[in-house]
Regions:
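Serine-dependent protease modules
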Residues: 2, 10, 26-312
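Hydrophobic membrane-insertion alpha-helices, especially the h-region
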Residues: 13-27
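N-terminal Sec-pathway targeting helices
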Residues: 4-16
Length: 312
């Protein structure tokens, strides 16, 4: 006798068996539902040592160069009398000083400006920018090893923005050798080293940045414009001011003035001097005085205390 309930149970039972058999077969074939699949962990791509060796070599060159050069770089503090504060510091260079613009120290202290420099002889001669030390009645020099000394201003040259100072350390100092800035090529790697401190902070001292030579022989009219407005020089500004800057994209900021621009061979090829900026901070354009020009100025300052120029 036909029993509808029993028939329904049989159909359900056969359907369940068929489903389980089908599931077992598909699982064995690897057709598992995606919702239950284990995530596949990708293996890290293997890069051959040969492929990255040039980059590693360049990185190691930067490291070796920074280690070798930094001991010869110094931080400079130049104290100016209050009477000289607004007259001796050109507006175009004021952004390079640690002291905020328009903010002076008490009259008894004068104004302290910060900059950089680098030792060029074991007996303590140091190159820097004229605008870092001009008009100062007291100059202190700080080394990376925490030593510091009073410095004597040997001479300054506003027409090239080069200055020479000297310290007496009582022992030979680490010094940078001169490169040949005439041989520097556009696209060549360089390092810029200095002290981009802000607000008299030493927390950023001896910062190393890298970049390339972006251009050569840049005449910015920076020195001419500043000197032309100075009653000490008048029309001599356009006659004697020399602007032949090396341009770089290495980061240069306030306090870097006077620090070295160094080639990968470890030679100084320039003196960091200025930036082109609408904000007073780095925007991709830094400029350095070619070391060949600075060296000629230095030699005259050592011998005469000033730069001898031909006169007609």
């Amino acid at each position: 006798m036909y029993d509808p309930l029993r028939a329904k149970v049989k159909v359900a039972l056969y359907s369940a068996i068929a489903f389980l058999v089908g599931l077992a077969i598909t699982s064995g074939l690897g057709w598992t539902s995606k919702s239950y699949a284990m995530p596949v962990i990708a293996e890290t791509a293997q890069i051959s040592p040969e492929a990255v060796q040039p980059a590693l070599d360049l990185s190691q060159a930067f490291t070796n160069l920074a280690d070798a050069v930094t001991p010869a770089v110094v931080r400079i503090e130049a104290r100016r009398p209050v009477t000289a504060t607004n007259q001796e510091i050109p507006d175009a260079f004021r952004r390079f000083f640690d002291s905020p613009e328009g903010q002076n120290q008490p009259p008894s202290q004068g104004q302290v400006a910060g900059g950089s420099g680098f030792v060029v002889s074991e007996d303590g001669y140091i190159l820097t920018n004229n605008h870092v030390v001009e008009g100062a009645d007291e100059v202190k020099v700080y080394f990376p090893d925490r030593r510091y000394f009073d410095a004597e201003i040997i001479g300054t040259d506003p027409f090239t923005d080069v200055a020479l100072i000297k310290v007496n350390a009582g022992e030979p100092l680490p010094a940078l050798s001169f490169g040949n800035s005439d041989n520097v090529k556009v696209g060549e790697w360089i390092l810029a080293i200095g002290n981009p401190g802000f607000g008299n902070s030493a927390s950023l001292d001896f910062t190393v940045t890298a970049g390339i030579i972006s251009a050569r022989g840049r005449p910015l009219q920076l020195l001419q414009n500043e000197l032309r407005s100075d009653p000490r020089f008048g029309d001599q500004a356009s006659r004697w001011a020399i602007e032949d800057f090396l341009q770089t994209d290495a980061v240069i900021n306030p306090g870097n003035s006077g620090g070295p621009m160094v080639s990968l061979s470890g030679h100084a090829v320039g003196i960091n001097s200025a930036i082109a900026s609408t904000t007073g901070a780095y925007q991709g354009y830094g400029f350095a005085i070619p070391i060949n020009l600075a060296r000629r100025v230095m030699e005259d300052l050592v011998e005469y205390g000033y730069v001898k120029r031909p006169r007609i």
